[in-house]
C-alpha cells in the first residue's frame, strides 16, 4: 500500500482523523441498519394482509415511517444543537427497538404499524450522524465512509437475521428485536463510556 500522500504532519493528521471519524460514522450507521433491516431476512411464508404479501406490506409501512421522518428531519436536524445529538440518537434507537418488540408481540395486522414507528424513529439518523462530520476539511472523505455503510450493512443485517433464525431458532417476528437489542446495547455501552 502506497502512503506517499502522507507528506507532512497535517496530511498525516487528516489521514488519522479520516480513519477515526469516518470509521465511527460507518459503524454508527451500520448499527442503525441492525435496527432497520434484519426483518428483510424473513420470508413470512403464507402470510398476507389486505390481499397483499405480508412482507411487502411490512416493508411499505416501514418506508412510510422513514419517509415521514425525512420531512420532519428537515426542520428537526437543522435546529438540533450539538449537545443534544447523542440524546437524540439514543432516544431514536430505543424507540426503534421498542417498535421491533411491538412487532414481535402485537398480533397481525397491528404489528405492521410498529414497523411504521421503527421507520419513523430511524429516518433522521443519517442526518444526525452526518452532522457530526459535516463542515470539516475532509467531509467528502468522511461522507464516503458513511455512505459505504449502506452497502455493507444492508447485506450484513440480512445475513445476521438468517443466522439468528437458522442457528438459534428465533422466530421471524422476534429476530429483528433480538438483533436490534444487540445494537442498542452496543450504542448505549459506547454512550456510557463517553460520560
Where are these regions (language model features)?
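Pair of pore-lining "gating" transmembrane helices in MFS-fold secondary transporters
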Residues: 14-35
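Intracellular juxtamembrane helix-capping segments at the cytosolic ends
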Residues: 124-135
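Central cavity-lining transmembrane alpha-helices of secondary-active solute carriers
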Residues: 60-75
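Helix-loop-helix hairpin linking two adjacent transmembrane segments in secondary transporters
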Residues: 157-186
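Hydrophobic core of transmembrane alpha-helices in multi-pass small-molecule transporters
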Residues: 110-124
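Conserved small/polar residues in nucleotide/adenosyl-binding loops
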Residues: 187-194
Amino acid at each position: 500500500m502506497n502512503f506517499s500522500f502522507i507528506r507532512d504532519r497535517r496530511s498525516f493528521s487528516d489521514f488519522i482523523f479520516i480513519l477515526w471519524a469516518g470509521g465511527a460514522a460507518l459503524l454508527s450507521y451500520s448499527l442503525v441498519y441492525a435496527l432497520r433491516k434484519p426483518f428483510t431476512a424473513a420470508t413470512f411464508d403464507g402470510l398476507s394482509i389486505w390481499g397483499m404479501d405480508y412482507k411487502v406490506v411490512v416493508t411499505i409501512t416501514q418506508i412510510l415511517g422513514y419517509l415521514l421522518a425525512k420531512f420532519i428531519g428537515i426542520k428537526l436536524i437543522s435546529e438540533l444543537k450539538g449537545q443534544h445529538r447523542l440524546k437524540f440518537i439514543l432516544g431514536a434507537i430505543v424507540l426503534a427497538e421498542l417498535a421491533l418488540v411491538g412487532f414481535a408481540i402485537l398480533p397481525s395486522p397491528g404489528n405492521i404499524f410498529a414497523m411504521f414507528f421503527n421507520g419513523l424513529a430511524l429516518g433522521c439518523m443519517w442526518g444526525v450522524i452526518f452532522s457530526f462530520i459535516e463542515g470539516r476539511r475532509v467531509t467528502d472523505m468522511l461522507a464516503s465512509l458513511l455512505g459505504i455503510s449502506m452497502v455493507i450493512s444492508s447485506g450484513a443485517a440480512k445475513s445476521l437475521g438468517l443466522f439468528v433464525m437458522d442457528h438459534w431458532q428465533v422466530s421471524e417476528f422476534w429476530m429483528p428485536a433480538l438483533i436490534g437489542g444487540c445494537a442498542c446495547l452496543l450504542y448505549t455501552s459506547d454512550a456510557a463510556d463517553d460520560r
